[in-house]
Amino acid sequence: MGYFITFEGIEGCGKTTQIKRAAQSLREAGHRVVVTREPGGCPIADDIRAILLDAGNSAMVPTTELLLYAAARAQHVAEVIAPALAEGAVVLCDRFTDSTLVYQGFGRNLDRDLIARLNTLAAGQIRPDLTILLDCPVAVGLARAAARINSRQTNREERFERESLLFHERVREGFLSLAGGEPHRFAVIDGNDGVEATATAVADVLLNRVPRR
């Protein structure tokens, strides 16, 4: 069986950059690494992702959003994550069930027990062995996210970047609450410490937690 690592955090926390660095480090150590993301990771889930993140879909109600995430995850787990783990790979996933619990539960105030049941329905027995939470102040993360959008030279915003500051504060608090409840699974890393310092901290966690080849 492989090893499943998820990366979590607010918008603009630096997950994408750190996942790339982590994948390189693990491959150099001899691991077979699969990098994926949610929502998305396979064609059907990518189609759902486009609907979920499109800022034009502002009329989407929270329950619709939740069910779309669950549908995307069910396909992603069946098509990508479960097979890779069965083959012994280290799977790095940009967001997983914790994001749904935090964004739709803490952020949207949907029933968290219901979300947990849907997460179980979608993911089955797949659970992260390690979750790296990159934490940074909301203002910092949103500024980074805005810069990322500007760098694309497009006016297209993603739906979550249009949410209120209070929404994003609830999301951050939600992640920290989950981490506090499962300290054995979560490694909380300062995502406001610069790319290199953050990468070093992530590498230290991986060295201590991922089984060696």
UniProtKB/Swiss-Prot annotation:
Gene3D superfamilies registered for this protein in UniProt: P-loop containing nucleotide triphosphate hydrolases (3.40.50.300)
Organism field: Geobacter sulfurreducens (strain ATCC 51573 / DSM 12127 / PCA)
UniProt-annotated binding residues for ATP: G9, I10, E11, G12, C13, G14, K15, T16
Family: Belongs to the thymidylate kinase family.
Role of this protein: Phosphorylation of dTMP to form dTDP in both de novo and salvage pathways of dTTP synthesis.
Protein name, UniProt field: Thymidylate kinase
GO cellular component: cytoplasm; cytosol
Enzyme Commission number(s) from the entry: 2.7.4.9
Enzyme class: transferase
Catalysed reaction equations from the record: dTMP + ATP = dTDP + ADP
Entry keyword set: ATP-binding, Kinase, Nucleotide biosynthesis, Nucleotide-binding, Transferase
